[in-house]
């Protein structure tokens, strides 16, 4: 089958990019590809059998027209000016059978005009982390970019030490970022901001294109998508680590996996980025930061969208987030109906977990085994303060009895939203260390496991992390 590519970005937004081709690595070789995703995109298997090829920037497919995008943004709350694709190149936009498109973005593809002081490269460590994280999030049901392939090489890339150079093929319906809009707003080119908005509406919100109120309705949906995404992050214990405005997806996708982390111990103020000295991007601050970022996006639209309309959309953010978060947390607790004591029970559990430094994922998964008429719980042994747990657990069982549903039905619901497996940093690190020695077995094995996060397991993927694996510090270097 011949793949079809279109050039919408190149044709319609000529001032938002520089056209250039990838710079290949030395002795590049394909070490992993996403068979399931490739099948979904109708990519012929033969493309993965001819060396690094397009996956390593050595060749382009017919119809591809590579370019690096320019955007700007706020980083850690401070205006950073022009940024852009410093090591990534958009190879093309694949046209799918249903008429939608999928960006092929090659990360680590070499120097671009937006590399600033960087070398345009990515290291094997960071490409493995992003491939694992994006696929883990996808199978958890959270909107995200996807990973299609990883190429490693003999090219050394220098970070804290010399590391193997690598490339990741990332795919997404769009790489539109808040930072694209900021770039032209701060250059006082509001008409180009409007052109970006029109491009987004035309291709991703086409049902609004002929509506006289299209900009307000579109921005309201961007707010809602962002609120929903952040709510989902919070329910699975995901910390992004670097929520700069240039890392915010207009479509509400999880974008740019750098120093991310999933909670091990329940620690509301968890900071996964060792460069985040003030805790701006801590786990519990993510909802507030996302709203701040939306406010920056709204500012760029203010020359042609009424401020009252923008503020009305922003004012809806908290309620949308709380609604999505509340619905999912009630499911995690096994509540079928909504009762007034639900929030108090959840907050009491969180307080207990924080005091005891309980494992976030294991706690909710083990809670899924609760039988409402039994005082016994496998979770009890996870707590030192048994009296405090017993008191909470008695109230929790009483609440369960208000819903007329069998234990088996409720347990099935809970186990469908409380994963047994999340991508803990130590699991990724183990796969990385093996891969850097040339052994890809664990990389493939872990990818396979992450496809079934809600299935029961009895291996170390779902055990408590080892002491060395807790609070692994991760930097932005990639």
Curated annotation (Swiss-Prot):
It catalyses: L-seryl-[protein] + ATP = 3-O-(5'-adenylyl)-L-seryl-[protein] + diphosphate; L-threonyl-[protein] + ATP = 3-O-(5'-adenylyl)-L-threonyl-[protein] + diphosphate; L-tyrosyl-[protein] + ATP = O-(5'-adenylyl)-L-tyrosyl-[protein] + diphosphate; L-histidyl-[protein] + UTP = N(tele)-(5'-uridylyl)-L-histidyl-[protein] + diphosphate. It comes from the Bacteria. ATP binds at residues 84, 86-87, 107, 119-120, 170, 177, 256. PANTHER family: PROTEIN ADENYLYLTRANSFERASE SELO, MITOCHONDRIAL (PTHR32057:SF14). Belongs to the SELO family. It is an enzyme of class 2 (transferase). Nucleotidyltransferase involved in the post-translational modification of proteins. It can catalyze the addition of adenosine monophosphate (AMP) or uridine monophosphate (UMP) to a protein, resulting in modifications known as AMPylation and UMPylation. Keywords: ATP-binding, Magnesium, Manganese, Metal-binding, Nucleotide-binding, Nucleotidyltransferase, Transferase. GO terms for molecular function: AMPylase activity; ATP binding; magnesium ion binding. The keyword DNA-binding does not apply. Mg(2+) binds at residues 247, 256. This is Protein nucleotidyltransferase YdiU. The active site is at residue 246. Disulfide bonds: none annotated. Its EC number is 2.7.7.-, 2.7.7.108. It comes from Shigella sonnei (strain Ss046). Its cofactor is Mg(2+); Mn(2+). InterPro entries: adnlytase_SelO, SelO.
